[in-house]
Protein backbone atom coordinates (compact mmCIF):
# COMPACT_ATOMS: atom_id res chain seq x y z
CA UNK A 1 0.00 0.00 0.00
CA UNK A 2 2.83 2.41 -0.87
CA UNK A 3 1.68 6.04 -0.94
CA UNK A 4 -1.79 4.89 0.01
CA UNK A 5 -3.89 5.78 2.99
CA UNK A 6 -5.84 3.71 5.46
CA UNK A 7 -9.24 5.25 6.13
CA UNK A 8 -11.00 4.87 9.47
CA UNK A 9 -14.57 5.69 10.47
CA UNK A 10 -17.02 5.04 13.29
CA UNK A 11 -20.58 4.21 12.35
CA UNK A 12 -23.95 3.61 14.00
CA UNK A 13 -24.45 3.95 17.74
CA UNK A 14 -21.47 5.20 19.71
CA UNK A 15 -19.76 2.96 22.26
CA UNK A 16 -17.16 3.82 24.89
CA UNK A 17 -13.79 2.60 23.67
CA UNK A 18 -14.19 3.77 20.09
CA UNK A 19 -11.63 6.51 20.72
CA UNK A 20 -9.19 3.95 22.09
CA UNK A 21 -9.65 1.96 18.86
CA UNK A 22 -9.11 5.07 16.69
CA UNK A 23 -5.93 5.78 18.63
CA UNK A 24 -4.67 2.21 18.26
CA UNK A 25 -5.37 2.03 14.52
CA UNK A 26 -3.73 5.40 13.87
CA UNK A 27 -0.60 4.77 15.91
CA UNK A 28 -0.12 1.18 14.75
CA UNK A 29 -0.54 2.27 11.13
CA UNK A 30 1.96 5.11 11.42
CA UNK A 31 4.40 2.86 13.32
CA UNK A 32 4.28 0.42 10.41
CA UNK A 33 4.79 3.07 7.74
CA UNK A 34 1.23 3.87 6.65
CA UNK A 35 -0.74 7.09 6.63
CA UNK A 36 -4.21 7.41 8.08
CA UNK A 37 -7.23 9.48 7.12
CA UNK A 38 -10.08 9.93 9.55
CA UNK A 39 -13.57 10.00 8.06
CA UNK A 40 -16.05 12.05 10.06
CA UNK A 41 -19.71 11.11 10.69
CA UNK A 42 -19.44 7.54 9.46
CA UNK A 43 -20.66 6.54 6.02
CA UNK A 44 -22.60 9.79 5.73
CA UNK A 45 -19.36 11.73 6.09
CA UNK A 46 -17.61 9.44 3.64
CA UNK A 47 -20.22 10.25 1.01
CA UNK A 48 -19.83 13.97 1.75
CA UNK A 49 -16.03 13.83 1.64
CA UNK A 50 -15.48 14.80 5.28
CA UNK A 51 -11.96 13.42 5.44
CA UNK A 52 -8.83 14.57 7.31
CA UNK A 53 -5.38 13.06 7.74
CA UNK A 54 -4.72 11.89 11.30
CA UNK A 55 -1.39 12.15 13.11
CA UNK A 56 -0.24 10.69 16.40
CA UNK A 57 -0.92 14.09 17.96
CA UNK A 58 -4.53 14.00 16.78
CA UNK A 59 -5.15 10.84 18.78
CA UNK A 60 -3.20 11.86 21.85
CA UNK A 61 -5.12 11.88 25.16
CA UNK A 62 -8.28 10.31 23.75
CA UNK A 63 -7.97 6.79 25.15
CA UNK A 64 -9.87 7.84 28.28
CA UNK A 65 -12.68 9.67 26.49
CA UNK A 66 -16.11 8.27 25.74
CA UNK A 67 -17.87 8.80 22.43
CA UNK A 68 -15.86 9.14 19.22
CA UNK A 69 -13.71 12.03 18.03
CA UNK A 70 -14.64 11.10 14.45
CA UNK A 71 -18.34 11.53 15.26
CA UNK A 72 -20.84 8.95 14.09
CA UNK A 73 -24.10 8.79 12.23
CA UNK A 74 -26.51 6.39 10.62
CA UNK A 75 -26.69 6.74 6.84
CA UNK A 76 -29.74 5.87 4.78
CA UNK A 77 -27.93 7.17 1.70
CA UNK A 78 -25.19 4.54 2.03
CA UNK A 79 -27.80 1.78 1.83
CA UNK A 80 -28.45 2.79 -1.79
CA UNK A 81 -26.22 1.94 -4.79
CA UNK A 82 -26.05 5.65 -5.64
CA UNK A 83 -24.80 6.50 -2.16
CA UNK A 84 -22.12 3.82 -2.22
CA UNK A 85 -21.00 5.00 -5.65
CA UNK A 86 -20.46 8.49 -4.24
CA UNK A 87 -18.55 6.99 -1.32
CA UNK A 88 -16.29 5.06 -3.69
CA UNK A 89 -15.48 8.22 -5.63
CA UNK A 90 -14.32 9.82 -2.38
CA UNK A 91 -12.21 6.73 -1.61
CA UNK A 92 -10.51 7.14 -4.99
CA UNK A 93 -10.06 10.89 -4.63
CA UNK A 94 -8.52 10.55 -1.16
CA UNK A 95 -6.22 7.72 -2.29
CA UNK A 96 -7.62 5.39 0.38
CA UNK A 97 -6.73 1.77 -0.28
CA UNK A 98 -8.21 0.15 2.83
CA UNK A 99 -11.09 1.08 5.10
CA UNK A 100 -11.41 0.25 8.79
CA UNK A 101 -14.95 0.43 10.11
CA UNK A 102 -15.77 0.50 13.83
CA UNK A 103 -19.41 -0.32 14.50
CA UNK A 104 -22.14 -2.90 14.95
CA UNK A 105 -24.01 -5.26 12.64
CA UNK A 106 -25.52 -2.52 10.48
CA UNK A 107 -22.13 -0.88 9.97
CA UNK A 108 -20.45 -4.17 9.09
CA UNK A 109 -23.31 -5.07 6.75
CA UNK A 110 -22.63 -1.83 4.90
CA UNK A 111 -18.93 -2.67 4.78
CA UNK A 112 -19.62 -6.13 3.37
CA UNK A 113 -21.84 -4.79 0.58
CA UNK A 114 -19.37 -1.99 -0.21
CA UNK A 115 -16.46 -4.43 -0.39
CA UNK A 116 -18.40 -6.72 -2.72
CA UNK A 117 -19.38 -3.90 -5.08
CA UNK A 118 -15.99 -2.19 -5.26
CA UNK A 119 -12.38 -3.25 -4.98
CA UNK A 120 -11.90 -1.81 -1.50
CA UNK A 121 -10.38 -3.78 1.33
CA UNK A 122 -12.57 -3.43 4.43
CA UNK A 123 -11.69 -4.46 7.97
CA UNK A 124 -14.29 -4.28 10.73
CA UNK A 125 -13.87 -3.71 14.45
CA UNK A 126 -16.83 -4.74 16.65
CA UNK A 127 -18.05 -1.55 18.31
CA UNK A 128 -21.44 -1.92 20.01
CA UNK A 129 -22.62 -2.05 23.61
CA UNK A 130 -25.02 -4.87 22.69
CA UNK A 131 -22.22 -7.47 22.41
CA UNK A 132 -24.27 -9.20 19.73
CA UNK A 133 -21.73 -9.79 16.95
CA UNK A 134 -21.01 -13.44 16.22
CA UNK A 135 -17.41 -14.64 16.38
CA UNK A 136 -16.10 -12.43 19.16
CA UNK A 137 -16.48 -12.92 22.90
CA UNK A 138 -16.67 -9.19 23.53
CA UNK A 139 -17.38 -6.01 21.58
CA UNK A 140 -15.96 -2.56 22.21
CA UNK A 141 -18.21 -0.68 24.64
CA UNK A 142 -19.97 -3.66 26.17
CA UNK A 143 -17.96 -3.81 29.39
CA UNK A 144 -18.32 -0.08 30.04
CA UNK A 145 -22.07 -0.22 29.47
CA UNK A 146 -22.37 -3.25 31.73
CA UNK A 147 -20.54 -1.43 34.52
CA UNK A 148 -22.72 1.64 34.04
CA UNK A 149 -25.89 -0.45 34.33
CA UNK A 150 -24.68 -2.14 37.51
CA UNK A 151 -23.79 1.22 39.05
CA UNK A 152 -27.26 2.55 38.23
CA UNK A 153 -29.04 -0.55 39.51
CA UNK A 154 -27.12 -0.35 42.78
CA UNK A 155 -28.55 3.14 43.28
CA UNK A 156 -32.04 2.02 42.28
CA UNK A 157 -31.80 -0.79 44.85
CA UNK A 158 -31.27 1.80 47.58
CA UNK A 159 -34.51 3.61 46.84
CA UNK A 160 -36.42 0.40 46.10
CA UNK A 161 -35.48 -0.98 49.50
CA UNK A 162 -36.44 2.25 51.25
CA UNK A 163 -39.96 2.08 49.80
CA UNK A 164 -40.54 -1.71 49.56
CA UNK A 165 -40.85 -1.43 45.78
CA UNK A 166 -40.34 -3.48 42.65
CA UNK A 167 -38.35 -1.77 39.91
CA UNK A 168 -38.37 -2.83 36.29
CA UNK A 169 -35.13 -1.48 34.82
CA UNK A 170 -34.92 -1.34 31.02
CA UNK A 171 -31.52 -1.65 29.37
CA UNK A 172 -30.33 -1.67 25.77
CA UNK A 173 -29.49 -4.75 23.74
CA UNK A 174 -32.23 -4.95 21.08
CA UNK A 175 -32.48 -8.65 20.17
CA UNK A 176 -29.68 -9.76 22.50
CA UNK A 177 -29.86 -10.21 26.25
CA UNK A 178 -26.18 -9.99 27.19
CA UNK A 179 -26.49 -6.65 28.99
CA UNK A 180 -29.65 -7.60 30.86
CA UNK A 181 -28.56 -11.10 31.84
CA UNK A 182 -25.10 -10.20 33.07
CA UNK A 183 -26.08 -6.95 34.78
CA UNK A 184 -28.81 -8.87 36.62
CA UNK A 185 -26.26 -11.33 37.97
CA UNK A 186 -23.73 -8.61 38.82
CA UNK A 187 -26.29 -6.43 40.63
CA UNK A 188 -28.09 -9.23 42.46
CA UNK A 189 -31.36 -8.63 40.61
CA UNK A 190 -34.27 -10.99 41.11
CA UNK A 191 -34.89 -11.65 37.42
CA UNK A 192 -33.89 -10.76 33.86
CA UNK A 193 -36.25 -10.67 30.90
CA UNK A 194 -34.28 -11.29 27.73
CA UNK A 195 -35.22 -12.05 24.10
CA UNK A 196 -33.58 -15.48 24.29
CA UNK A 197 -35.71 -16.61 27.25
CA UNK A 198 -39.01 -14.78 27.53
CA UNK A 199 -40.56 -14.83 30.99
CA UNK A 200 -44.32 -14.72 31.51
CA UNK A 201 -45.94 -12.69 34.27
CA UNK A 202 -46.76 -15.68 36.47
CA UNK A 203 -43.12 -16.80 36.39
CA UNK A 204 -42.13 -13.26 37.23
CA UNK A 205 -44.42 -13.21 40.25
CA UNK A 206 -42.82 -16.42 41.45
CA UNK A 207 -39.35 -14.86 41.29
CA UNK A 208 -40.51 -11.68 43.00
CA UNK A 209 -42.90 -13.23 45.50
CA UNK A 210 -40.51 -15.79 46.92
CA UNK A 211 -38.18 -12.98 47.92
CA UNK A 212 -40.88 -10.87 49.56
CA UNK A 213 -42.19 -13.93 51.38
CA UNK A 214 -38.78 -14.46 52.92
CA UNK A 215 -36.62 -11.51 53.93
CA UNK A 216 -36.54 -9.18 50.93
CA UNK A 217 -38.27 -5.83 50.86
CA UNK A 218 -37.42 -4.91 47.25
CA UNK A 219 -37.07 -6.54 43.85
CA UNK A 220 -35.21 -5.58 40.71
CA UNK A 221 -36.09 -6.98 37.29
CA UNK A 222 -33.77 -6.13 34.38
CA UNK A 223 -35.54 -6.03 31.01
CA UNK A 224 -33.98 -5.88 27.54
CA UNK A 225 -35.45 -3.03 25.51
CA UNK A 226 -38.07 -4.01 22.97
CA UNK A 227 -38.19 -1.83 19.84
CA UNK A 228 -41.76 -0.70 19.23
CA UNK A 229 -42.83 -2.87 22.19
CA UNK A 230 -43.27 -5.89 19.92
CA UNK A 231 -42.54 -8.28 22.75
CA UNK A 232 -42.88 -5.93 25.67
CA UNK A 233 -40.32 -3.67 27.35
CA UNK A 234 -40.10 -2.65 31.01
CA UNK A 235 -43.31 -0.59 30.88
CA UNK A 236 -45.24 -3.51 29.41
CA UNK A 237 -44.15 -5.93 32.12
CA UNK A 238 -44.61 -3.41 34.91
CA UNK A 239 -48.17 -2.71 33.77
CA UNK A 240 -48.93 -6.44 33.61
CA UNK A 241 -47.67 -7.00 37.14
CA UNK A 242 -49.60 -3.98 38.44
CA UNK A 243 -52.78 -5.29 36.85
CA UNK A 244 -52.50 -8.93 37.87
CA UNK A 245 -50.82 -8.43 41.25
CA UNK A 246 -52.08 -5.06 42.56
CA UNK A 247 -50.52 -5.62 45.97
CA UNK A 248 -47.08 -4.73 44.68
CA UNK A 249 -45.74 -1.16 44.46
CA UNK A 250 -44.17 -1.10 41.00
CA UNK A 251 -41.92 1.46 39.31
CA UNK A 252 -40.03 1.66 36.00
CA UNK A 253 -36.61 3.09 35.24
CA UNK A 254 -35.38 3.29 31.63
CA UNK A 255 -31.62 3.86 31.58
CA UNK A 256 -31.47 4.88 27.92
CA UNK A 257 -28.40 6.62 26.58
CA UNK A 258 -26.63 6.67 29.94
CA UNK A 259 -25.37 3.26 28.85
CA UNK A 260 -23.50 4.64 25.85
CA UNK A 261 -21.57 7.44 27.52
CA UNK A 262 -18.75 7.80 29.99
CA UNK A 263 -15.06 7.00 30.14
CA UNK A 264 -14.34 3.49 28.86
CA UNK A 265 -13.47 0.82 31.39
CA UNK A 266 -9.94 -0.59 31.55
CA UNK A 267 -11.20 -3.74 29.82
CA UNK A 268 -12.66 -1.75 26.93
CA UNK A 269 -9.49 0.32 26.55
CA UNK A 270 -7.38 -2.83 26.38
CA UNK A 271 -9.80 -4.61 24.04
CA UNK A 272 -10.02 -1.63 21.68
CA UNK A 273 -6.23 -1.24 21.68
CA UNK A 274 -5.69 -4.91 20.85
CA UNK A 275 -8.31 -4.99 18.12
CA UNK A 276 -7.11 -1.72 16.58
CA UNK A 277 -3.51 -2.88 16.42
CA UNK A 278 -4.62 -6.26 15.07
CA UNK A 279 -6.50 -4.52 12.24
CA UNK A 280 -3.21 -3.14 10.92
CA UNK A 281 -1.53 -6.53 11.29
CA UNK A 282 -4.42 -8.08 9.35
CA UNK A 283 -3.95 -5.61 6.50
CA UNK A 284 -0.23 -6.36 6.35
CA UNK A 285 -1.08 -10.07 6.17
CA UNK A 286 -3.35 -9.43 3.20
CA UNK A 287 -6.61 -10.03 5.05
CA UNK A 288 -9.70 -8.34 3.67
CA UNK A 289 -13.40 -8.15 4.41
CA UNK A 290 -13.15 -9.61 7.90
CA UNK A 291 -14.06 -8.47 11.40
CA UNK A 292 -11.32 -8.55 14.01
CA UNK A 293 -12.61 -10.38 17.07
CA UNK A 294 -11.35 -11.93 20.27
CA UNK A 295 -12.08 -15.49 21.37
CA UNK A 296 -10.55 -17.14 24.42
CA UNK A 297 -8.28 -14.09 24.68
CA UNK A 298 -6.87 -14.70 21.19
CA UNK A 299 -7.28 -12.42 18.16
CA UNK A 300 -9.40 -13.99 15.40
CA UNK A 301 -10.49 -12.96 11.90
CA UNK A 302 -14.21 -13.46 11.29
CA UNK A 303 -15.63 -13.14 7.74
CA UNK A 304 -18.25 -10.39 7.56
CA UNK A 305 -20.94 -12.82 6.45
CA UNK A 306 -20.49 -14.85 9.66
CA UNK A 307 -20.24 -11.87 12.00
CA UNK A 308 -23.49 -10.30 10.82
CA UNK A 309 -25.57 -13.27 9.68
CA UNK A 310 -25.13 -15.71 12.54
CA UNK A 311 -26.89 -15.26 15.87
CA UNK A 312 -24.53 -15.03 18.83
CA UNK A 313 -25.77 -17.48 21.47
CA UNK A 314 -26.17 -16.43 25.07
CA UNK A 315 -24.83 -18.70 27.80
CA UNK A 316 -28.02 -20.41 28.97
CA UNK A 317 -26.29 -21.61 32.15
CA UNK A 318 -26.35 -18.01 33.36
CA UNK A 319 -30.16 -18.16 33.42
CA UNK A 320 -29.87 -20.98 35.95
CA UNK A 321 -27.26 -19.07 37.94
CA UNK A 322 -29.51 -16.02 38.24
CA UNK A 323 -32.52 -18.13 39.20
CA UNK A 324 -30.65 -19.99 41.93
CA UNK A 325 -29.01 -16.91 43.40
CA UNK A 326 -32.11 -14.70 43.45
CA UNK A 327 -33.97 -16.59 46.20
From Swiss-Prot:
A Gene Ontology molecular function term of the record: 6-phosphofructokinase activity
Positions annotated to bind ADP: 23-27, 157, 188-190, 214, 216-218
Binding site for Mg(2+): 105
Superkingdom of origin: Bacteria
Matching PROSITE patterns: PHOSPHOFRUCTOKINASE
Keyword hit for Transcription: no
Regulation (activators, inhibitors): Allosterically activated by ADP and other diphosphonucleosides, and allosterically inhibited by phosphoenolpyruvate.
Catalyzed chemical reaction(s): beta-D-fructose 6-phosphate + ATP = beta-D-fructose 1,6-bisphosphate + ADP + H(+)
Gene Ontology cellular component terms for the protein in this record: 6-phosphofructokinase complex
Sorted UniProt keywords: Allosteric enzyme, ATP-binding, Cytoplasm, Glycolysis, Kinase, Magnesium, Metal-binding, Nucleotide-binding, Transferase
Catalytic center residues: 130
Cofactor: Mg(2+)
Enzyme Commission numbers on file: 2.7.1.11
InterPro entries linked: ATP_PFK, ATP_PFK_prok-type, PFKA_ATP_prok, Phosphofructokinase_CS, Phosphofructokinase_dom, PKF_sf
Binding residue positions for ATP: 13, 74-75, 104-107
Localization: Cytoplasm
Pfam families documented for this protein: PFK
Pathway(s) annotated for this protein in UniProt: Carbohydrate degradation; glycolysis; D-glyceraldehyde 3-phosphate and glycerone phosphate from D-glucose: step 3/4
Swiss-Prot/TrEMBL GO biological process terms: canonical glycolysis; fructose 1,6-bisphosphate metabolic process; fructose 6-phosphate metabolic process
Top EC class, one word: transferase
Function noted in UniProt: Catalyzes the phosphorylation of D-fructose 6-phosphate to fructose 1,6-bisphosphate by ATP, the first committing step of glycolysis.
Family, per entry: Belongs to the phosphofructokinase type A (PFKA) family. ATP-dependent PFK group I subfamily. Prokaryotic clade 'B1' sub-subfamily.
Protein name: ATP-dependent 6-phosphofructokinase 1
Organism: Bacteroides thetaiotaomicron (strain ATCC 29148 / DSM 2079 / JCM 5827 / CCUG 10774 / NCTC 10582 / VPI-5482 / E50)
Record gene name: pfkA1
